[in-house]
């Protein structure tokens, strides 16, 4: 029995993909019934659509791997690369007017928008090669551990394709169903994607205006505070206050009373003390409310710090180039 089961699993994993059978996946049939009753989708059309969907064992394999936790000094090297910095400068130069417009409308500075796109997809170069329909169907119907979440995202995907008049067979994205240059999940697309150029479509796959406007809108709706700081380095003696909370838990007035030396920021600002693994010794940082807002995009302190440092590096590099051109 065990040998037969093991052989069957080997055969299953060895397949690159196979069709989604409604007989094999009754949860898919229940999903179709729910979409029909709740959102008035045509059941026959959905059955036809899912007959073309493919279950991808490679996606299950990737999702099932244990997450590898890297220390900050290794994580940083992935994103703070010369290529990512140079291409970020070029992206900023190429779309300067759109970035300025997004800052006027949403209050989000260009460097944050540029850094998000740099970290997520290398400015649109690596947006994923899976059909979103296949990725979300695989995870909704063949990955029980997170089936509920991905079924909701599949629901949102079908709704957005109907709203945007897209063929659900066409959009491509990551193995988890994240889409476009900013890697929005379908629920995020429906809430935050912006038609920034007013052409009647929200295109985060090919339209730089919509990409930039959508990222800016995401941050604005998540509570970005215009012209407020993101993070600043602290001396090691503040280490005892460090914690892993994402939400800011101190006012600056409280931190000053606790002996944390701070630049002249308003006492009412909120922040948190963060400890990261440096290569030789811990790095202690103060993450303000805007640092927390970055974690709304990806709930990781390391991710938020990578975005912040990439943003500051790109901005500094661009300013150096502009200064050199004037002299």
List where the protein language model places each region.
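Positively charged n-region of N-terminal signal peptides that target proteins for export
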Residues: 1-4
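N-terminal signal peptide c-region/cleavage motif recognized by signal peptidases
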Residues: 13-16
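An acidic, Gly/Ser/Thr/Pro-rich helix-cap/linker signature
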Residues: 20-94, 100-103
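A contiguous strand-loop segment
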Residues: 27, 34-52, 147, 151-172, ...
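Solvent-exposed loop/turn segments at secondary-structure junctions
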Residues: 54, 120-124, 178, 237-238, ...
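Acidic/His-rich structured neighborhood in mature extracellular/periplasmic domains
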Residues: 75-214, 220
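Flexible, glycine-rich surface segments
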Residues: 168-279
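C-terminal functional modules
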Residues: 271, 276-327
